[in-house]
Every structure is written in structure tokens, then in C-alpha cells.
From Swiss-Prot:
Keywords: Oxidoreductase. This is Probable glycine dehydrogenase (decarboxylating) subunit 1. Coiled coil: none annotated. It comes from the Bacteria.
Length: 445
């Protein structure tokens, strides 16, 4: 709510009601030595003056830096319709009510969101969102334990390292085993992943594109996992799904990912939303809210929160998830983003990301001593090998107003020279050319 200070007349009226002659008399019972003498605050400012100061502070904090950073969170366009529609009073809340008969508008929007996620992932059922990509991966791992009644999960080490930490933390609390399989260069080691699957394995978790930016086909891994009774979980980058084969097409049982890139701005950690989708036969093990479509006794279409017996307000400790308020406002933004672009626009956006990244790859590898570490296909993210440690180089470019990428040594010891660069549709040719020039200058100094 807005803050409207009391006028002098209102203050006098309130004091009269309680029988006090002044503010000083009101606080007289408090000993003088305990009262604040002065707050030493500057005089108030106009809205314009305050906005100018806040813009200056934002600029000092790096708001004007050109980002080539990805690693799970990406700088994408946001159509004006996303901000406009999601800020309507009917939607402007991040809370989803427990009541199955809550606002039909809210429920229909979330139902449409679920439909969009199913189309993107090639799956049959989706929930109404989770906190973020990391918790979505972890919830998928827990889901696989319930479905298979096993307690071992194989993790590809080329998935987002932060997501890996969340998964291992969740599994540790349940005394379940997490087995990490080292990558093969910048790609998943499919042979070692397959060899790691045994009769106690609940699921294999991979990411496509992975943290290094490599795109791979996991169809064979899905077949081998199913032969052993295990599930395949694929964590995906939603924008890439406009160009890359979906988890469903590859035979995955559960698809997850972070929805930040779908209409949600960069925001120092959130709030964002995570998506999770699965096959229809696993829907009762799907965590979180699920909105269903039905027909009432008058033949009218309606929407309800369905399959609620899975949830904590009914089953408590037996619930499939203890997440109660989901990220429905962020998920709504994701829906509006996808609807604004449409199928063709979404595909064009993915192609634009790919093309710009390919141009950047060619420009950056033109710098002496720089090479691409990815052996196969990449989307809008790729990993470079520099002739010197990447972290100091990134610091030099940051001083010039360019965030050059993610030095991998912080996540993968021994990869001191590796730098993962991300190029979205927002990066211009001039910005890419400047990155190449600054990189060359930094490597020569």
C-alpha cells in the first residue's frame, strides 16, 4: 500500500480523541534520556530528485555493463505486454490459494501456462511452477525416488553446478546416494553415464544444453536407463527448445528447467520460477499445484486445483512436496512471454540466439591463442580456452564495462583457462566486436 503521511489537522484530531494536547505530551511517559533527540535525516526530496539519485546508484552497481554471462540466468528481451498484463491487479500476487474453487481467471492462466510448458518440453503433464531451476531439478530427483522406490541417482557433472549442489543436499537428507559422472571434455560422457546405471538407480539427470553450452542427443541414454528400470530427467533451457529437440522427443520421463528467460528480468537471484513436466502416468507423483479443466453440472467449462490429496495441507508429512506458495506471478510472465511471441516467433528467437553466438564464436576464436573447447553443437553459449587464466581477464574486461563470461575454475578445479561466454539476441554486432577487441587487448597485456 502507498504511504500517505498524516496532515497537521489529522494529527490534532487524533490527539484530541486520545486526550493528549501534543505529540510531546503523548510521549511524556517515556524518560527523556531514552528518547531519540534527532534522526539526523536530510530534508525530503521530490520524486524526480529521488529517481535521479537511484539511477546514479544503479549505474555505479553495474546496471550499464554489457553482459555476456549466462550460466543459468540470461539477458533476454521482454515484450512490453509482459509487464503490462502481469501488473494487472487481478494477477499481481505470487501466491496461489489452496481453495480448489479460487479465481477462475487465475486458474485458467495457470492452466494455459501448464499447456505451454507441455508443448515446450514434449511432455503430457505439468504443474503450476516451482521456485526455480535448481529446486525443479531436486524435486524431479525426489519424484524419481518415489516412482521407482529406489535410492540412487546418477548426476552428470556437466549440469549447472549450483543445481547439482541442491540435488545432493536434498538426497543427503534422505540418505539417498548421489553419484556424479565427470564430463568428457565439455560434453556428457554417455558411455560412463550408461555404465553407472544399475538396478538401484532411480534416475539419471542430464542437462541440454549443458553448463558448458554443449547440445547432445540423449535418446540412447533414455533407452538404456529404461532397460534398467531407471528414469531419465533432462534439465532444459527453455529458449533453446525453440531449436533443440525437446526432452520428450529424446525419451525423457521428467523435464525441468529455470523459467527466468521466459519474460523475467535479471534480478540478483530472483524471484524466478522453475518448471517441471512429466508423463501422464507419473502425474500423481508430480510435486506442487496442478490446475485441471472440468465441466460443471450446467455443462460450463471450469478450472480447479486438482489431485490435491498429494499436497501438504491434506497429507502433511506424506505430501509429494512441501512447497505451498509457488511462483505463479513469474510463471504468468512466462505464459505471456510465450503467447506474445507465438510458435513462429519463439523459433525465430531461438535461431537469432544461435546465429549471434556463432558469429561471436568466429570473432573470438580469431583472437590469437583462443579456441573453442566444445567438440560438437552449441546453442547460444560456448566455452573458450584462453592462453592464460580466465578470471583475471574477466576482471580486466569488467573494468571496461563488459562482463565477458563465467570463469569455470570456480566450479571445475583445473579449468583455469576456461571461459564460458553467452550471446543472446540482445547483444549487437558492435558489442560482440568490442568484446573481441577487448579480449585481444587483455590477452596481449
Amino acid at each position: 500500500m502507498g504511504y500517505c503521511p498524516n496532515t497537521p489537522d489529522e494529527i490534532r484530531e487524533m490527539l484530541a480523541v486520545i486526550g493528549a494536547g501534543s505529540i510531546e505530551e503523548l510521549f511524556a511517559p517515556i524518560p527523556a534520556e531514552l528518547r531519540a533527540k534527532s534522526f539526523d535525516l536530510p530534508p525530503g526530496m521530490s520524486e524526480f530528485e529521488l529517481m535521479r539519485i537511484m539511477r546514479e546508484k544503479a549505474a555505479a552497481g553495474g546496471a550499464e555493463i554489457v553482459p555476456f554471462i549466462g550460466g543459468g540466468i540470461y539477458d533476454h528481451i521482454i515484450p512490453a505486454a509482459v509487464d503490462h498484463l502481469s501488473s494487472r491487479a487481478e494477477f499481481y500476487t505470487a501466491y496461489t490459494p489452496y481453495q480448489p474453487e479460487c479465481s477462475q481467471g487465475t486458474l485458467q492462466a495457470l492452466f494455459e501456462y501448464q499447456s505451454v510448458i507441455c508443448r515446450l518440453t514434449g511432455m503430457e503433464a505439468s504443474n503450476a511452477s516451482l521456485y526455480d531451476g535448481g529446486t525443479a531439478v531436486a524435486e524431479a530427483a525426489l519424484m524419481s525416488l518415489r516412482i521407482t522406490e529406489r535410492n540412487r541417482v546418477v548426476l552428470d557433472a556437466s549440469i549447472n553446478p549450483l543445481h547439482r549442489e541442491i540435488v545432493t543436499g536434498y538426497l543427503h537428507g534422505l540418505s539417498a546416494e548421489a553419484v556424479e559422472v565427470a564430463p568428457d571434455g565439455c560434453g556428457s560422457d554417455l558411455k560412463r553415464l550408461i555404465d553407472s546405471i544399475d538396478e538401484e538407480t532411480a534416475a539419471v539427470i542430464v542437462q541440454n544444453p549443458n553448463f558448458f553450452g554443449s547440445v547432445q542427443d540423449f535418446s540412447e541414454l533414455a533407452v538404456k536407463a529404461h532397460e534398467k528400470g531407471a528414469l531419465l530427467i533432462i534439465s532444459g533451457y527453455p529458449i533453446a527448445l525453440g531449436l533443440v529437440a525437446s526432452p520428450g522427443e529424446m525419451g525423457a520421463d521428467i523435464a525441468v528447467g529455470d523459467g527466468q528467460s521466459l519474460g523475467n528480468p535479471l534480478s540478483f537471484g530472483g524471484p524466478y520460477f522453475g518448471f517441471i513436466a512429466t508423463r501422464k502416468r507419473f502425474i500423481r507423483n508430480l510435486p506442487g499445484r496442478i490446475v485441471g479443466e472440468t465441466i460443471d453440472n450446467q455443462g460450463r467449462r471450469g478450472y480447479v486445483l486438482t489431485l490435491q490429496a498429494r499436497e501438504q495441507h491434506i497429507k502433511r508429512h506424506k505430501a509429494t512436496s512441501n512447497i505451498c506458495s509457488n511462483q505463479s506471478l513469474c510463471a504468468l510472465r512466462g505464459l505471456i512471454f510465450c503467447a506474445s511471441l507465438g510458435r513462429k516467433g519463439f523459433e525465430e528467437l531461438a535461431v537469432l540466439n544461435y546465429d549471434k553466438a556463432q558469429y561471436a564464436k568466429s570473432r573470438l576464436t580469431g583472437v590469437k591463442g583462443v579456441s573453442v573447447m566444445n567438440a560438437g553443437t552449441t546453442f547460444n553459449e560456448f566455452t573458450l580456452s584462453l592462453p592464460k587464466d580466465a578470471a583475471p581477464v574477466v576482471e580486466k574486461l569488467l573494468a571496461c564495462g563488459v562482463a565477458a563470461g563465467v570463469p569455470l575454475v570456480q566450479y571445475y578445479p583445473g579449468m583455469d583457462n576456461a571461459l564460458t561466454v553467452t550471446v543472446t539476441e540482445k547483444r549487437s554486432k558492435a558489442e560482440i566486436d568490442r568484446l573481441a577487441a577487448l579480449l585481444e587487448e587483455a590477452l596481449c597485456s
